[in-house]
């Protein structure tokens, strides 16, 4: 599939503290956060003018799901627009609390674990053809996804019985199965629940829930573009070396605890291979595939270059070449500088605070955004593109139809209902348009429905 639909869903951690103590429960904070949403959407589960979905997920986690994107750069702009929309809700909630005499700071974290050991996710969606062998797809993908944390993990200081360690992935500790239809109870690598949100005879939606939420735009680019390339190779029938892991769940943890990428994990055929070996194999196949088929767009070439530089940097032990581009490395270097300046151990509560502050999406306060202001991290999209994505849907997919419909209905004060595939006017005629093709950005039926308002 040379043109693919992508989507990202990010759940955010939420808290409110006053002088270091928790002031409100997450439920209470979430209610304040979503009060403005409920006032205009009459619900805490809404679709927005930019085609995205914003809702309160299980456990009081605000979740933002981007509209359908058919380019990785569009996807990054829309994921970052979600951060900005939630930051707006945070500022509004903070003001409401102060107006009501409740003093404290509201925080939204784009991370994957809280201090109580709970995990919440970043889910990636990739549209695939219904006609492929889904089980085979999963088999080839799992070794890639288990080792992918080495190139796009968000990093975390993990407290273990043997002391604190720096782990490359936040999510790795919370994955319990390879392939499953559950997302919360068992937390698989790939979720198989068959909800294509498209024509079920033609498409299937691959739902990957193993990845970390990324602050870094370049890490996000590498995460999605590399996965897309592996999918394209599988779809094209490229023969891959059998890298099936003997125990993917043990392997994901072992790899997460090893920043060098050299720790060997057992393969099903009895051999052993390191995360560097496995990622190197996928990279070499992808490079060859892109060159032979002349698929080298600027985004693909940028991702391949970063993939190669990241593996080389990890192999050499000199991370300076990727300290602006890969989340876990950016954060690790930040923590190491802070520890050296203040003579702190890795288990210090001040280090844990720094670890968390990296993911704070409130730009005047969050450490990632402090680095961005200093020009210490590399960007993929600029602020203007992110600002536009807050209100303008992707223009080349079904998200455009949804966004235009919502915009007109709100302007005309019409009652409506939408989901990923349906657009419905709640009038006497109950007119509904079913949009089964996520690639289709223009549809006469939708134009007519919009014109009739």
Curated annotation (Swiss-Prot):
Its EC number is 6.3.1.19. It comes from the Bacteria. Keywords: ATP-binding, Ligase, Magnesium, Metal-binding, Nucleotide-binding, Ubl conjugation pathway. InterPro entries: Pup_ligase, Pup_ligase/deamidase. It holds the Pfam family Pup_ligase. It is an enzyme of class 6 (ligase). The reaction mechanism probably proceeds via the activation of Pup by phosphorylation of its C-terminal glutamate, which is then subject to nucleophilic attack by the substrate lysine, resulting in an isopeptide bond and the release of phosphate as a good leaving group. Catalyzes the covalent attachment of the prokaryotic ubiquitin-like protein modifier Pup to the proteasomal substrate proteins, thereby targeting them for proteasomal degradation. This tagging system is termed pupylation. The ligation reaction involves the side-chain carboxylate of the C-terminal glutamate of Pup and the side-chain amino group of a substrate lysine. Belongs to the Pup ligase/Pup deamidase family. Pup-conjugating enzyme subfamily. This is Pup--protein ligase. It comes from Kribbella flavida (strain DSM 17836 / JCM 10339 / NBRC 14399).
């Amino acid at each position: 599939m040379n043109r693919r639909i992508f989507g990202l869903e990010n759940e955010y951690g939420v808290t409110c503290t006053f002088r270091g103590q928790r002031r409100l429960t997450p439920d209470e904070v979430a209610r304040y956060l979503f009060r403005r949403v409920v006032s205009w959407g009459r619900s805490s589960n809404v679709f927005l003018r930019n085609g995205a979905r914003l809702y309160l997920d299980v456990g009081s986690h605000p979740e933002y799901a981007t509209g359908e994107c058919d380019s990785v750069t569009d996807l990054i702009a829309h994921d970052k627009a979600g951060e900005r929309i939630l930051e707006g809700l945070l500022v509004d909630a903070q003001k409401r609390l102060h107006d009501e005499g409740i003093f404290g700071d509201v925080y939204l974290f784009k991370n994957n674990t809280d201090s109580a050991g709970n995990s919440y996710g970043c889910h990636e969606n990739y549209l695939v053809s219904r006609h492929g062998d889904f089980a085979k797809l999963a088999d080839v993908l799992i070794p890639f996804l288990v080792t992918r944390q080495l190139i796009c993990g968000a990093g975390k200081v993990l407290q273990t019985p043997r002391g604190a360690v720096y782990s490359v992935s936040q999510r790795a500790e919370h994955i319990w199965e390879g392939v499953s239809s559950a997302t919360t109870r068992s937390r698989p690598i790939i979720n198989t629940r068959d909800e294509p949100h498209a024509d079920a005879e033609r498409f299937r939606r691959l739902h990957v829930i193993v990845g970390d939420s990324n602050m870094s735009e370049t890490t996000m680019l590498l995460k999605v573009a590399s996965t897309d390339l592996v999918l394209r190779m599988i779809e094209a029938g490229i023969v891959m070396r059998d890298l099936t892991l003997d125990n993917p769940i043990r392997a994901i943890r072992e790899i997460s605890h090893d920043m060098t990428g050299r720790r060997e994990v057992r393969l099903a055929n009895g051999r052993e291979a390191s995360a560097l070996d496995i990622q190197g194999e996928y990279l070499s196949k992808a490079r060859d595939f892109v060159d032979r088929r002349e698929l080298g767009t600027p985004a693909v070439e940028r991702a391949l270059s970063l993939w190669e530089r990241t593996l080389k940097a990890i192999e050499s032990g000199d991370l300076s070449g990727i300290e602006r581009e890969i989340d876990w490395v950016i954060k690790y270097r930040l923590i190491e500088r802070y520890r050296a300046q203040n003579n702190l151990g890795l288990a210090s509560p001040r280090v844990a605070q720094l670890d968390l502050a990296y993911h704070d999406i409130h730009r005047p306060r969050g450490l990632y955004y402090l680095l961005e202001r200093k020009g210490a991290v590399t960007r993929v999209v600029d602020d203007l593109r992110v600002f536009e994505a807050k209100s303008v849907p992707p223009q080349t997919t079904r998200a455009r139809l949804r966004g235009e419909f919502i915009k007109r209905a709100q302007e005309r004060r019409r009652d409506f209902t939408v989901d990923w595939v349906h657009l419905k006017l709640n009038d006497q005629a109950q007119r509904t348009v079913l949009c089964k093709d996520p690639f289709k950005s223009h549809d006469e039926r939708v134009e007519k429905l919009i014109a009739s308002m």
